[in-house]
């Protein structure tokens, strides 16, 4: 993954994240070699066979984005959209960790649960959001995505287990 800074310089994501402490403005993202990337053997079949698919609460641009950019993955998820649930990693307009909120804003996306819903609306029929964002339910649903409100901040293994049970119980 490569980022282009506001100075027009393209650097590797690790350089941006570690050496520069993600403290520069990003104007573009490029996934090097993505045109020749292929899904791992059997992954497309597994997406089609799975009873549900869960998109973790990770950075939609640099963590989930490269996966969706692999030829065939986004299309497979679109085919299964009704069985796909995403969990928002943006809570109260901020990333719980890392530069996701800044990257979203710098690249012209909204750093909010509605922004995440918009990014995933073609591949996910459901978005799980934190209770902090419960007032955003209607905006999420305006993106054509069912909104599920629960505690998504996994501060303990007990809270993580509750979130897991909630998400696994959706769509069944």
Name each model-derived stretch.
Residues 97-172:
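C-terminal functional extensions of proteins
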Residues 67-74:
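Charged helix-capping and loop-helix junction motifs
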Residues 27-47:
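Active-site glycine-rich loop that binds ribose-phosphate moieties when present
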Residues 58-62, 90-92, 133:
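Short glycine-rich anion-binding loops that position phosphate/pyrophosphate groups of nucleotides
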Residues 75-81, 121-122:
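Short, conserved loop/helix-junction motifs that constitute active-site signature segments
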Residues 51-54, 83, 126:
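Structural motif
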Residues 1-31:
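Electropositive, gly/pro-rich neighborhoods at or near active sites that engage anionic ligands
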Residues 80-97, 152-154:
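Short, flexible loop segments at boundaries between secondary-structure elements
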């Amino acid at each position: 993954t490569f980022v282009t800074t506001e100075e027009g310089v393209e650097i590797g994501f690790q350089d941006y994240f570690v050496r520069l402490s993600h403290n520069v403005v990003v104007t573009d993202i490029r996934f090097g070699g993505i045109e020749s990337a292929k899904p791992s053997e059997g992954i497309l079949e597994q997406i089609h066979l799975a009873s549900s698919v869960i998109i973790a609460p990770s950075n939609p641009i640099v963590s989930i984005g490269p996966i969706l950019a692999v030829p065939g993955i986004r299309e497979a998820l679109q085919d299964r959209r009704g069985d796909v649930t995403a969990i928002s990693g943006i809570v109260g307009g901020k990333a719980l960790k890392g530069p996701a909120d800044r990257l979203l804003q710098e690249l012209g996306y909204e750093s909010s649960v509605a922004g995440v819903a918009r990014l995933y609306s073609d591949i996910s029929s459901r978005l799980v959001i934190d209770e902090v964002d419960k007032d955003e339910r209607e905006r999420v649903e305006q993106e054509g995505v069912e909104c599920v409100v629960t505690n998504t901040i996994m501060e303990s293994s007990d809270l993580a287990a509750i979130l897991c049970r909630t998400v696994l119980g959706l769509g069944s």
